[in-house]
Amino acid sequence: PELSQHTAADVAATFSGLLQQHGITVEAEPAAHAAPQGANPIASVSSATLSEILAFMLRHSDNTLAEEFGRLTALARSENNSPEGATKAVRTVLGNLKIDINGLTMADCSGLSPGSQLTVRTLAAVQQRNLTVGDGAPAAEGLSVAGLVGSARKRYTSDDVAGLLRVKTGSLDT
């Protein structure tokens, strides 16, 4: 299905059509209106915050969410909502933060596409910023914790290190 840009109107039109298919007369066209004063909601939607979703993405190495965050970055930077727009936007943001991106090659935002490369220097600079700048805390806190949680839960499980290391899991190609 195509992504709706006007979900309330689309739902109302679909509902109206279904009512008519079942012999119920609908006398007016769906239209947007403010709820009457004192009206009680009939439904609501809630979600985790973007910070919580980011932490989940990092902790569980969720590649689909990584791509989504790339696309959100692209849209926020007025780039195309595409893999190319996402990687361009991420590189621009990193550059604006004065993070060394020499040697960074992004074929996508998840790292799944062939050709993506990340230097230790770039990764360390991103994590350093996350640990020292207030708005980076969710990214730092979202990393897997060795021996405890996330994709590193079954790694480094000895008492000497379990719970002490926040790590980004994945594979490195040398």
Region roles according to the model:
Residues 35-36, 93, 147-151, 159-164:
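A generic short-segment signal for beta-strand/edge and adjacent turn/coil regions
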Residues 40-46, 154-174:
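Short, Gly/Ser/Thr-enriched beta-strand-loop segments that form substrate-interacting elements
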Residues 1-137:
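A small/polar active-site loop signature that marks catalytic segments
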Residues 129, 150-153:
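Short, highly charged low-complexity linear segments
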Residues 136-150:
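Active/binding-pocket-proximal capping segment
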